[in-house]
Amino acid sequence: MSPCENDTPINWKRNLIVAWLGCFLTGAAFSLVMPFLPLYVEQLGVTGHSALNMWSGIVFSITFLFSAIASPFWGGLADRKGRKLMLLRSALGMGIVMVLMGLAQNIWQFLILRALLGLLGGFVPNANALIATQVPRNKSGWALGTLSTGGVSGALLGPMAGGLLADSYGLRPVFFITASVLILCFFVTLFCIREKFQPVSKKEMLHMREVVTSLKNPKLILSLFVTTLIIQVATGSIAPILTLYVRELAGNVSNVAFISGMIASVPGVAALLSAPRLGKLGDRIGPEKILITALIFSVLLLIPMSYVQTPLQLGILRFLLGAADGALLPAVQTLLVYNSSNQIAGRIFSYNQSFRDIGNVTGPLMGAAISANYGFRAVFLVTAGVVLFNAVYSWNSLRRRRIPQVSN
């Protein structure tokens, strides 16, 4: 038992603050190494333009792939042993792997360690599950929206800090600095997160079929998982072509990298501002209304992105898109809370994370394939079509959920 734990009631607001800090630190740690990942791959002996592109893509994607595979296992363990234990396991495990990455001598070692990083991850979904099971239901939207800004903040600041550190100290030391950040996250979680959890034996655990039958509406839960996947596909599809699209719009300018970085980061800034506010609004009017409205708003913003003529126009549209995106995942998570029990929260949030990771892998592949065959502008139109399908699918699933409630 940590020093912060005693018999007094759990202060969920303090836990939310500490969990936010943990998500910020892990978000920053993950993104610290992203700016120079291809450079590190090259330093490990990969040469040639095509080989470098291939290996950079593989080592980037394999983390999400293995995270998708491992998340349900960790979610089940969280429901048995407690969510705090999973937070500690994730932070410490990732910290150790980061140290080993800094010591890697060839690309195969690095690839295995990137896969191991995915296997040992899971801080954010377990933080979501912890807060979701402690916060009052009528504040779920605000709490989960606020929590989501932690990871976004870390992901925004991480690349800038990582680039500066790599320029100042070299590539390998950044991995050791990242490990230190994760170890700090471990100790903050150990001493300041409180959870009253009664461990459940393996025999008492609900099996998959029992988990499904315990749900109020299994089809709705599945539709929310699909929505999470499509949200990440839509976000990731634009990532591979954004810099090239900005260069096409900007023409011959010397600071295209800076402009691209600004346009890449503005959605995150907008999400930081919108997520808590729209989450609070969702607590008042219903997260399903926020979800459908934000999806439709996203479609209406993605279509004109295909027709912009300047980087400024693209930047404004992406800022507005970020404001809508800031509401999407918290709304999905709030609906998951409303439609499942605390007993299975760890698994539900982990399954959702698996779908999110699959979207992180498939989104960039989809964007790259479309741009290679039809050009950059087609990516935005196809992505708008995918999000429109998601809006119709989600609306239909949520409408069916309301019909029995009205008849009753």
From Swiss-Prot:
Subcellular location(s) of the protein: Cell inner membrane
Keyword tags: Antibiotic resistance, Cell inner membrane, Cell membrane, Membrane, Transmembrane, Transmembrane helix, Transport
NCBIfam families, alphabetized: PRK09874.1 (NF007372)
Organism: Escherichia coli (strain SMS-3-5 / SECEC)
Family: Belongs to the major facilitator superfamily. DHA1 family. MdtG (TC 2.A.1.2.20) subfamily.
GO cellular component, one term: plasma membrane
One GO term (biological process): response to antibiotic
Mode of membrane association: Multi-pass membrane protein
GO MF annotation terms: transmembrane transporter activity
Function comment: Confers resistance to fosfomycin and deoxycholate.
SUPFAM superfamilies listed in its UniProt record: MFS general substrate transporter (SSF103473)
Chain ranges passing through the membrane: 16-36, 58-78, 92-112, 115-135, 146-166, 173-193, 221-241, 256-276, 290-310, 378-398
Cell inner membrane listed as a keyword: yes
Pfam families: MFS_1
UniProt-recorded name of the protein: Multidrug resistance protein MdtG
